[in-house]
Every structure is written in structure tokens, then in C-alpha cells.
Amino acid sequence: MSVATEGSSPSQVLADLHVHSEWSWDAPRGAMAESCRRAIALGIKAIAFTEHADYSALAAGARLDVAGYLETVADCKREFPRLAVWSGVELGEPHRFPAEASGLLTRGRFDLVLGSLHSVISGDSVLELSEVDQLAQADPQQTMRAYFAELVELIEGPVAFEVLSHLEYPKRFWLPGWAPYRSEEYEAEIRAVLEAAVGRDVALELNTSRGGDPTRALCPSPVVVGWWRQTGGRRLSVGSDAHDPTTVAAGFRLAGEIGAAAGFAPSAVRIGLWTSA
């Protein structure tokens, strides 16, 4: 996956490394071929289809058809030779489901493996962070601290992955009645996550959440990208988390500006990866 990027501007994001297609259980409007066409039209040079591999109750037993998915990736590689099309998977809570996650990784070759936390352990139950009815019963500060603590467990868990996805994910679903979310309120917890990622040589993702309101959508917040560099983080991955072709690379202009402001620049070795000096 080595593609030279010399000549690109410092704020230009050339790859979308977090996209879902029809092979993700929560992407009914996903379409891999159409997402490739959209990427080419936008000047994107590489796209990674990081399909969900979730084992929580929210996935309702949905399982990634690895063989079918990889066949579609191969078809798109042939159809779009101008675009680097990468296979990938987004492992949900792999530290809780190590046998399932590890087993999936043996069933095919994945160019990119993301690690994600979409829920947290809350007492004797699991709190799904995207479910408003469950969030309404939760304490926001306790939820965030539980989330950051479990992220450390995920990073240090038995299943290895390359990129930590959408840090600060719960703020996407922040309820109107809660006090505004501020990263600074959780700086110690966030820095512990970043230190764990540095220790395991995991890259941090800047996720634009399909180009939504930056206050809620940018995961993590710009200040956290700066902390990542301060902590010793050297690699930054950028992804839209698109679940349909229309939002491929959405929000990338702002993402590029944030990466550059924090001291990251597009890698001259691996397209899509941003590195610090």
C-alpha cells in the first residue's frame, strides 16, 4: 500500500480510510462501486472499505460475509484501476469478543484493521452509545469516564489492530439537556488513551462523521489531535465513516486543516496516512 504523495498540499486529504458499503449491517444505502466513483470524482486517490464486524446485541447477530465482501473489493479493484481500493474491517469491542474477532481476521486478507468502541459496560449491562433511549438514563460524565477507561482495555487487549477509530464517539449523540461536552474536562482520561495507543503503535483516526456539525462530528476534537502529537503520536488516519456514497470524504477540508495545524502532513510513503515530523 505504498503510494507516493509528493506534490500534495499540506491540507489535502488524499484517502478516505473509513468507509462502509453494502457489506456493513448498518449501511442499507451503502454501495461499494458507487463510493469508488464518488471518490474518483472528488480527486481521492485511495479508499478503504472498513466493514463492521460487531458482536454486540445491537448488531442482532449480523455477521460479515468475508468471502462475498472480498470478492466485491476485487471487482472494484479491476473496475477502478485509477483508485487504490483497500480491504478493511472495523472491529467492534474486540477485547470483549477476542475469539470472534481473531477468527474473522484469519478468514481473509485485510489491508486495514480498525478498533472501535460503540458501547460501554455499565454495571451488569451494556450501554449502547448510539441509542438515545439508553443514553437518557445515563449520567454523561460517568459514561464518558467509563468509555475512556474501556478504550484503554481495548487498545491493550489481545486483538491487535492498526487504527483507533472515532475517539470521543459518544459526543456524536450528546443529548440536548446535558451540559456541553468539553474535551478538556476529560483531559487526563483522554491522554491515558493516547499514551496506550502510542505504547501499542496504534494510529489515531480523525473521523469526520460524514461531515456533520464539527462540534459533535469531529472525533476526536481538534484539541485532542494536538494532544496526540504532544503524547508522541506520529500517525494520523482520516476517515469519513461514510455509510453511503454521498458522504465519502465529507468534511475533509476541515480535517486537513486540523491535521496540518497539529503538525501532521500527508505521508510520502503511505497515502492517506498523515505523519508528524
Regions found by a protein language model. Name each.
Residues H18, A39, V113, H166, ...:
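Conserved, mostly hydrophobic/aromatic
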Residues E184-A249, I258-G259, F264-P266:
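Active-site-adjacent C-terminal substructures of enzyme catalytic domains
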Residues G263-A277:
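Extended, intrinsically disordered, low-complexity segments
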